[in-house]
Amino acid sequence: MAQFCILGVLLILSGTHCSWGFHEETHYPCAFIDTANITGSYGLDGPFVHNWTVIPRHFVAVYDFVIENGIRIPASRHLRACVCKTKPCVRICCLRGEIYDLEKRQCLVPVAGVSSLPSHSHMEVELGNGSLRLVKLQPRFSIHVETPCEHMKAVTKGSEYVHWTLHENGTISHRGHIFSKHYCFTPLLHGNSTWEWQPLACAPEKLYFVLGVREWTYAICLLIAILSMFIVLMVYLMCSEMRNSFYGVAIKAYAICMILGYALLAYLTLHNPANLSNAACRILPSLALMNLVLSFYILSFIAFKLYLSFYGVVFTKLMFWLIFTPIVLVAVGWSFFVGFSYYGSRLIFGGDTCWFDPRNWSVMIYFYAPVFVACAISGFFYVLSQIYIRDQPDIETEKSFESIEKNRFKSFWKYFGYTAVVWVVCICSFAFNYYWENRSHLNYAVSFCMAFHGFAALYALIGKNQQIQNFLRRIDNGEDTCENSVPLSSFG
């Protein structure tokens, strides 16, 4: 068991404090929002030419990142120029003939029956002398047609739109208040009759931390599962007949993984991500992922060994660790990879949530997919075992497959079936929550399944295991159990 503790400590020590919140580097000539990708633009001996605009070389830099939805993400090296430094920029959300729909959060063609849209080529601008004039945009401004963020919102005063003024220098203001650079213009209906150009601001979808009855129920059910797994661990540690067997060691390793994984999930559920450091918000979920994924591959390892038991294969201590160590390293490597990977423009761990973001499908790819692979491997060996049992005469089967191993086989697969049901419920619950836009991994079905998982471990791994039951009877009768201790030379 010391080896498992060492592996956990090594993973913690390998985590590094990586602040992923974006800040502008001082060696870039301007803010990212003021730049445009000019890769492929014509470069003279001195300046560059982009969209018929001459850009001095000191406004050009090589970037190895882009910013999407306010988040900096790595990108291939490319040239960007401060086009808004050369000519004031005006950002329009959608192409000609389209408007940005605030409810559907995308560019759409307006429904028929409304008045025609205002021209994209002209807009009312306040000139330097203070006068307002409808001017053609192209000669005076660099026009960008895009939304700077995935979700945009209108800035209103009460329920009324604010009349923002576009200035000749590209700024937008209202009574001394300057609008953010992260904006785009779109026509919006004013009074259900006329269109008015309105700047929209970035509205990132914030996933707020909630600690309610549902979260506490989930945490309590996880605690029940943890206590159940702890009982399984203690019983298998005390049982001399199980202590040094392959099956006993594997079950103990599995119980440790489940205890640590569920404990970390409970901790993350009850703690606001805003109160955790960036490093903690990356390392803790990575550790939880490692333990949970590793637990499923331990079950696959047990299924493999139970199948080999039909052929009388006995694992030595060296064989056990030669097979088990790569499994641990793969789980550690996978969790480390996920902890520093992006899903779309967001880090998988960190930000609004310190677990998988329920607003996307990252949990299906990085958690449930490897779990499914482990279950498929286990199922494969279960099918092979059943084929072997079916093909053997009843008498020969009893001779070649000892009753102890047969009992382990039945109790293990009973528990595996319960485990599969629990995680199928978790997957289906997430899919339903996602479909109904309930941005959470949790519901009461998931919570109660966690408690059921703990009770299933007690029932199948202790209640249905004949060796454990015999050991508990000897304990109850006050018999000495140490005399049956087996040296750790081979794993049966």
Curated annotation (Swiss-Prot):
Record keywords: Cell membrane, Disulfide bond, G-protein coupled receptor, Glycoprotein, Membrane, Receptor, Signal, Transducer, Transmembrane, Transmembrane helix
InterPro entries: Methusela_ecto_dom_1, Methusela_ecto_dom_2, Methuselah_N_dom, Methuselah_N_sf, Mth_GPCR
Positions of glycan attachment: N37, N51, N129, N169, N192, N275, N360, N438
Superkingdom of origin organism: Eukaryota
Extracellular topology ranges: 22-218, 267-282, 339-362, 433-441
Cellular localisation: Cell membrane
Membrane topology classification: Multi-pass membrane protein
Membrane-spanning parts: 219-239, 246-266, 283-303, 318-338, 363-383, 412-432, 442-462
A biological-process GO annotation: response to starvation
Gene3D superfamilies: 2.30.160.11, Methuselah ectodomain, domain 2, Rhodopsin 7-helix transmembrane proteins
Any one Gene Ontology molecular-function term assigned to this protein's record: G protein-coupled receptor activity
Keyword Magnesium attached: no
Cytoplasmic topological segments: 240-245, 304-317, 384-411, 463-492
First-listed, main subcellular location of the protein, grouped into a coarse class: membrane
GO CC list: membrane; plasma membrane
Leader sequence residues: 1-21
Annotated disulfide bonds: C30-C82, C84-C89, C93-C184, C94-C107
Keyword Cell membrane in annotation: yes
Family: Belongs to the G-protein coupled receptor 2 family. Mth subfamily.
Protein name: Probable G-protein coupled receptor Mth-like 8
Species for this entry: Drosophila melanogaster (Fruit fly)
Gene responsible for this protein: mthl8
